[in-house]
A protein has these predicted regions:
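Nucleotidyltransferase catalytic core that binds NTPs
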Residues: 1-200
Length: 200
């Protein structure tokens, strides 16, 4: 099964642009998770084939200025999801809430430096896990060249065309959200995005 990962997750070691990387100690999966959905779960499960642990890091202040749902609620959703997948290897890391309070956003490079310091791991043992929706944005990341040099990257290709914005739009329009779009940890609390109809 581990060999199958090459077509689903591209592994890049720190300081390199290609080739096969060794397994990482920690994969850091940051994002709005607004809300988390089955596409996120798929990425997490595939990343576990490349990393010993996966940290789910919800954005507290978005680097590109997006407005997001309640931070504490998104943390609860991710913590529940982590427990269902594997509580020993997956966890929600709300570290962004306390990082760089004087800045408008927490950048990936700052986050990874903080996690390396907290965990005691050398930066090359940490990988930034990037979903398909953010892969094209990587060159726009703060200190992108340094980021790519210092830490590894796990690039997850999209296996289903599903994004959080699609769920939010359905709810704003008062339309039912397909059951296949919803995680069990989230579906009963989607009313926080407005609209009256839940998963159907």
């Amino acid at each position: 099964m581990r060999d199958e990962i090459s077509s689903r997750i591209r592994r890049l070691p720190a300081g390199m642009s290609g080739g096969r990387a060794p397994d990482f100690a920690l994969a850091v999966y940051g994002g709005a998770f607004d809300p988390p959905h089955p596409g996120h779960e798929s990425v997490i499960r595939r990343a576990l084939l490349c990393a010993e642990r996966v940290a789910l890091v919800p954005s507290h202040r978005h680097a590109f200025g997006k407005r997001m749902g309640d931070f504490e609620l998104r943390c609860r959703w991710l913590a529940r999801l982590a427990r269902r997948i594997d509580p020993r290897r997956v966890y929600c890391e709300p570290i962004e809430a306390g990082l760089m309070p004087d800045r408008p956003a927490v950048y990936s490079i700052d986050l990874l430096e903080a996690l390396a310091a907290r965990s005691g791991l050398a930066s090359p043992r940490i990988a930034l896990l990037i979903g398909a929706d953010n892969a094209a944005e990587l060159p726009r990341f703060e200190r992108a060249a340094e980021l790519c040099w210092r830490v590894g990257r796990l690039g997850a290709e999209e296996r289903r065309p599903l994004h959080s914005s699609m769920i939010r739009q359905r709810l704003r329009e008062g339309r039912a959200v397909p059951e296949a779009w919803c995680l069990p940890e989230v579906k009963d609390e989607l009313h926080c995005y407005g609209g009256e109809r839940q998963a159907g």
